[in-house]
Amino acid sequence: YGIPAYNFLKHIQSNYPGRVAGTEKETEMAVFILSVLLNGGYAESDIAIESFEIDDSTPMMDEAIQNVFDGGEKSNSSQNILITKKGESEKTIIVGAHYDSAGTHGVDDNGSGVSVALENALRMVNTPTYYTIQYVFFGSEEPGMYGSRAYVESLSEKERENIILMINIDTVLAGDYLYLYGGKVNDNGTVDNTEAVFKAYEIVKEIGLNIQLPPDGNNDYPYPTGQKRSDHAPFNDIGIPYIYFEANNWENGSPVETEKNGLIMHTDMDDLDFIENEYSGRVQNTLSSYSTLLYSLLQENNWEQ
């Protein structure tokens, strides 16, 4: 587990730097994802492309982000790539990862999530599952989760009812600790919808993976939730349970990602060569751990509460 993901990541590092929302590079990355899936055994009828508009005038992105690479001509449209693997049940698990990046190599954020999802999609193509699995590669997360918001807004009532779980994989390469988050924070600060993440954590312990829940006692992010700024948020907003995979470092109460270098995401350190030189063995370990867990979660047939 994790070796195919690593090979995808090396390809992304070399070929798709600066895949900023709406740019040619973002579109090229979408084409790459489609080619992997079509060559990996999925039929064209399993795949859908969902286009949507993006508004470039409201970037949520941090001004400090270094645009190291030019992603080419920019437009105000982007797309999600949807792949459906039918299970015995119509009840569906969404596996999501955004494929756009800041103006960097974007291997941590979020070539890593894309690579783990692609590896899993190829592994599952001929694997019988109880639940239907839909892989969604979201465009344009960085400027404000445009892809996941468009996806959730497009769902029919029936489709919403059928989605029992969303697994979001975002920035799983460089952080010091491997985390799982979940749960919906209520207005009074209590947290609901935690059954899925706690079940996932039990599976982590059964397998013996070095993945943990975030530290308890953080007033800004009630346990076991994490930051809202990723593609699980629109699903959470409509009450769909989620499990969010992210490598980070919360040991001192705020997410610094790495003790040694601070944030890797959104900086020019988001580069596979740099990460491998700085953190020997971390890349393979992280990809392997999350790939193993994802496969195990999708083998379960009792996610409905």
Question: What residue spans do the PLM features occupy?
Answer:
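Acidic/histidine-rich catalytic neighborhood of metal-dependent amide-processing enzymes
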Residues: 77, 101-195
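Second-shell loop/turn segments in exported
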Residues: 1, 13-27, 34, 67-72, ...
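Extracytoplasmic/secreted proteins, especially bacterial periplasmic and envelope-associated proteins
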Residues: 4-11, 24-42, 47, 112-119, ...
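Catalytic-core environment of secreted peptidases
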Residues: 2-17, 36, 40, 71-136
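Solvent-exposed loop/turn segments at secondary-structure junctions
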Residues: 18, 53-57, 87-89, 99-104, ...
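A non-catalytic alpha/beta surface segment that caps or lines the substrate-entry region
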Residues: 10-84
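Structural recognition of the beta-strand scaffold that forms the well-ordered cores
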Residues: 46-48, 80-84, 92-96, 134-137, ...
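Active-site-adjacent substrate-binding region
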Residues: 177-305
